[in-house]
């Protein structure tokens, strides 16, 4: 990475030239006396970003049919239920409408202060599994 950032600022602590203030930053000469190649720097910056960016799910992994999607959501929630039940609570799928997954939290989960975080975790798992954004909302009882 050093070659990317060869050019740096230094603080001029010497005597100030007439009309300039001491302590003003000035550019240090890059190694080899050449200016850095901006295009190469930007290309490398983009390449590093592409490597670090998460890849979208492959087309074969994405669920597309609504019936299939509902089955996948129900299965994933069923897999998570034992964790909720171990803590004295439960989660139940109420419905799937478009990008909204409605669930019912019961037992100790219904009044838990961490229920928002729990729903966020369920939502994250569903997004990864379905390959598209969804919102998990609790059932609202009137």
From Swiss-Prot:
It comes from the Bacteria. Residues 14-23 have a biased composition (Low complexity). The lineage of its organism: Bacteria, Pseudomonadati, Pseudomonadota, Alphaproteobacteria, Rhodobacterales. Pfam families: NifU. Keywords: Nitrogen fixation. The gene is nifU2. This is Nitrogen fixation protein NifU 2. It comes from Rhodobacter capsulatus. The keyword Transport does not apply. GO terms for molecular function: iron ion binding; iron-sulfur cluster binding. May be involved in the formation or repair of [Fe-S] clusters present in iron-sulfur proteins. The keyword rRNA processing does not apply. Belongs to the NifU family. GO terms for biological process: iron-sulfur cluster assembly; nitrogen fixation. Residues 1-36 are annotated as: Disordered.
